[in-house]
């Protein structure tokens, strides 16, 4: 019924909140915009997040130290510094205790994982189960993805 209530990080890509749940109980009579809250990467316990996210192309020639600083700042702003457990493969590597359903809507993106890299084309679907990962835009235009993140107990 309108644009996303909240967004953050448009200068490097961005997160655009559509809907959030904070548990398993849903009040069907309230009219609260559940996306109009502070943006954090992960959903709360037993909660979920439904969002768009945009990945801008990485400018050529940016030193890895600068990319590390940008990534650290971006994750700090969304309460996710603790999710950056191993950034040796890419500065934006992170891991959440969630199951994620992600669809690439437009663009040319590579999903970097600990053991492999997967190049995606529009309409490809990714199911992530608590993996350490990063996204890289291979194109000249911003890439747009949509994601559902569901809090999970990983084993």
Residue ranges and their predicted role:
Residues 16-17, 50, 102, 133:
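A broad, low-specificity signal marking well-ordered, structured residues that form hydrophobic/aromatic
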Residues 52, 101, 117, 125-127, ...:
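Conserved hydrophobic/aromatic beta-strand scaffold that supports enzyme active sites
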Residues 1-34:
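N-terminal leader/capping segments at the start of a protein or of a new domain
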Residues 117-121, 130-154:
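Ligand-binding loop in jelly-roll beta-barrel domains
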Residues 49-96, 129-132:
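Conserved short histidine dyad/triad with adjacent acidic residue
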Residues 22-35, 40-43, 151-155:
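Non-heme Fe(II)/2-oxoglutarate
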Residues 88-122:
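A short beta-strand-loop-beta hairpin characteristic of the jelly-roll/cupin
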């Amino acid at each position: 019924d309108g644009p996303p209530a909240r967004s953050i990080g448009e200068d490097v890509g961005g997160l655009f909140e559509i809907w959030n749940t904070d548990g398993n109980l849903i009040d069907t009579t309230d009219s609260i915009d559940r996306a109009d809250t502070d943006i954090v990467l992960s959903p709360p316990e037993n909660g979920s997040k439904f969002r768009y996210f945009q990945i801008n192309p990485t400018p050529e020639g940016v030193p890895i130290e600068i990319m590390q600083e940008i990534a650290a700042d971006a994750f700090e702003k969304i309460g996710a510094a603790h999710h950056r457990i191993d950034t040796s493969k890419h500065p934006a590597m992170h891991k959440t205790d969630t199951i994620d359903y992600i669809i690439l809507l437009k663009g040319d993106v590579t999903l970097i994982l600990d053991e492999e890299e997967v190049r995606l084309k529009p309409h490809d679907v990714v199911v992530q189960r608590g993996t350490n990962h990063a996204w890289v835009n291979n194109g000249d235009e911003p890439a747009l993805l949509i994601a559902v993140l569901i809090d999970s107990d990983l084993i």
